[in-house]
């Protein structure tokens, strides 16, 4: 097949134009990272070649000595990063460089704030390494040829970063990619061998491929360093995770994280372990400092790279960690898996099951250590972790039955114990503060913290000084449905079933409720008749001390909050009729006993108020307003 010698003038995708502007403005203060990003891309290209060559050795084209070469030209004012990895075809260049063809693009741009520091972090997360070249260059030339294609299928891509680029077919004898940066004015300090070497050692020492430069020697005659023809390897060129832990510095761990996670910030915490036994594997797993912008997209990229005997196999190895730990980044290197392992094999592999269980154990252990830390640093780290990843950790209660108790101990909530709005109360904290005779862990669910705090269902609990956990994250309904108890204590919604305080409720209160139920039997039946199909029942309650009424559901029925959540997500839900509970001591209820003319209006308002108080929406707001107006007028006319 002959290559068509064409030269095209093309425009960047709109998002790429936006990204190029962001790059220059948000990342200039950390401009050195351009070299890290280009080297990282070159390393990935070599990994992909190794993997494809497992089934097609001809891709090496008699050149299996993979390396990355960095060079510079003072006169031309250029820096070049070249690799002999997999390379790209013409279409791949268009797909990978002219466009951003990935999910989450819209979410990424929506998340941008205009704050340089925050935007720099987001840009890093998005994985836009190649474009970082434009931080220091006003023109970038890329030449490439994909392994397996003949020499006349080379491609040259060139752009000034203004919104367009040229693309032409060229003859390229060697496979791989070469990126040449034509530096902007004022960036000449980068045209220095010592400077480039220091950047490579700082950011890319962990890269497993040799990163080579031409050796430089001092010339007495020229009174400067001169470049020789001898190659010199700048980095250690060994798998960082395979080194003994005591030989790896904190800075090296951090830089390796930035490489695998495409992040610009150091990680929050990490665990590095070698497992020996039936399965032998090494894991280096990181918890990021901030949540990615697509964290709540359960189909988003997972962060674990799989290696087999230090040979890269795949990115995004979802089988290695459960979905609720999708924020974890890092690598797992197996000694036992076959080199030709596929995603299909991973789904059925017993070795993978064992590695997954071991990795979950390590991550949860790391989080346990942070949660139990007595140091200010440890406490601050766990606080940050929960703020960033707490909601997805709650998913684990339903997803990971084997570790449910362990995950439950990591959960943090707001409660009525204090006025704090931070989720810093653990279930163990709650159990430790339970009153003598208290047998249940009480909670209320709502669509916001404000709604939870003002829920009428809390009134009797506040009166008796019984702590209630306030749940307002969307995932919380799913959480409590899958966590029936903790340390032998049943979790009980304060808005479900009849009020049951167990030993905390004295006999006098029980008798009083029975008495009131008898006295108000006629009233509750009359209200129920008026409300008809809107309610399942109407009954007297002692759970209210200030409000006239509230809505509850039967113990095993869907809560009103969950019903609203599912409907808002577009799911078809069978409506659960609530039970209207009324406070016999409230003036509004007492008035109803003697009301005749406007009994139906007062009954409907009682129900509508209770619905609004729990965050519900009125089916007929106009009728509600009309009734309120009529009652205002009737009350005024009596005076």
From Swiss-Prot:
Pfam families: HATPase_c_3, HSP90
Superkingdom of origin organism: Bacteria
Chief localisation class: cytoplasm
One term of GO molecular function: ATP-dependent protein folding chaperone
Renumbered residue ranges of the record's region A: 1-343
One CC-aspect GO term: cytoplasm
Locations listed in the record: Cytoplasm
Sequence segments annotated as region (B): 344-564
Keyword Transcription regulation: no
Assigned keywords, A-Z: ATP-binding, Chaperone, Cytoplasm, Nucleotide-binding, Stress response
Location of the region described as C in the Swiss-Prot/TrEMBL record: 565-639
PANTHER family referenced in this protein's UniProt entry, alphabetically: HEAT SHOCK PROTEIN 90 FAMILY MEMBER (PTHR11528)
Subunit field text: Homodimer.
Family note: Belongs to the heat shock protein 90 family.
Functional description taken from the UniProt entry: Molecular chaperone. Has ATPase activity.
Stated name of the protein: Chaperone protein HtpG
Species this protein is from: Nitrosospira multiformis (strain ATCC 25196 / NCIMB 11849 / C 71)
